[in-house]
């Protein structure tokens, strides 16, 4: 049952990738000739490094402030806000490092294969801060959709750009705030970005159904494919 569930989740992720290519094409070739912009030009909050606290500041109870760490997100999404580590923060630290909905966080120092790992913040349940080996920024939602941009940032197209900017040291590499602002991103019309984000939201709902299908009836991935993936894209 678990193997079948994982297989369905993998197929749903593949549907997102296929839909992205169908709507926007290969980002390197940009066959639809969408404009390219510097990531910094579509930000409303510039990249900011996160909070460093010694291990002694971390607490085992539920009374501290949750902190997002690198192991807390995967493939553009926070894995589980309920399982974040907690620590003691001052009011000033909370105000300065507080995450808000639709922020994007990106790994700034790590082994080279994980450098640039990122996630969109969605579904915050309480005040949450972010740690020092990542940066946080916020996008102009009148120009771009954060779900679309996060998908772009998770692509090989961006990872190759990060590799050219990375400062390499023994066992790790780093990027700085200027490097992130200088990344080139393909920016289609906002209406198309929003269509893609709506599709991702539908897939995410289906992932929840897959998770609950073990105790109930199996999730019908073929029906989902016919009802959503085969829906025509609205031209702009």
Placement of each model-derived feature along the sequence:
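Short, solvent-exposed loop/turn positions at domain surfaces
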Residues: 3, 92-93, 169
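Non-catalytic DNA-recognition/assembly elements of restriction-modification systems
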Residues: 4-51, 182, 186-236
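Sequence-specific dsDNA recognition surfaces
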Residues: 40-58, 71-104
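Carboxylate-rich, polar loop motifs that coordinate divalent cations or form catalytic acidic clusters
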Residues: 65
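A short beta-sheet element
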Residues: 69, 94-154
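A short glycine-rich beta-alpha junction/loop motif
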Residues: 126-135, 144, 167-194
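Periplasmic-binding protein-like
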Residues: 158-163
């Amino acid at each position: 049952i678990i193997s079948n569930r994982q297989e369905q989740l993998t197929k749903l992720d593949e549907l997102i990738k296929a839909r992205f290519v169908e709507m926007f094409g290969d980002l390197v070739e940009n066959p639809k000739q969408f404009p390219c912009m510097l990531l910094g030009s579509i930000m409303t909050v510039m990249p900011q490094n996160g909070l460093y606290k010694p291990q002694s500041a971390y607490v085992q109870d539920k009374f501290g402030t949750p902190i997002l760490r690198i192991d807390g997100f995967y493939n553009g999404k926070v894995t589980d806000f309920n399982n974040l580590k907690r620590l003691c923060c001052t009011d000033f630290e909370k105000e300065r490092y507080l995450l808000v909905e639709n922020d994007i966080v990106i790994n700034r120092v790590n082994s080279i294969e994980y450098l640039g790992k990122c996630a969109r913040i969605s579904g915050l349940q309480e005040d949450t801060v972010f740690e020092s080996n990542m940066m946080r920024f916020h996008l102009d939602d009148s120009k771009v959709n954060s779900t679309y941009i996060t998908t772009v940032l998770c692509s090989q197209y961006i990872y190759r750009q990060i590799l050219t900017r990375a400062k390499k040291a023994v066992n790790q590499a780093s990027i700085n705030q200027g490097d992130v602002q200088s990344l080139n991103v393909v920016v289609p019309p906002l209406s198309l970005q929003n269509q893609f984000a709506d599709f991702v939201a539908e897939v995410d709902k289906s992932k929840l159904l897959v998770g609950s299908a073990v105790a109930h009836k199996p999730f019908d991935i073929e029906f989902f494919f016919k009802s959503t993936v085969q829906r025509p894209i609205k031209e702009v």
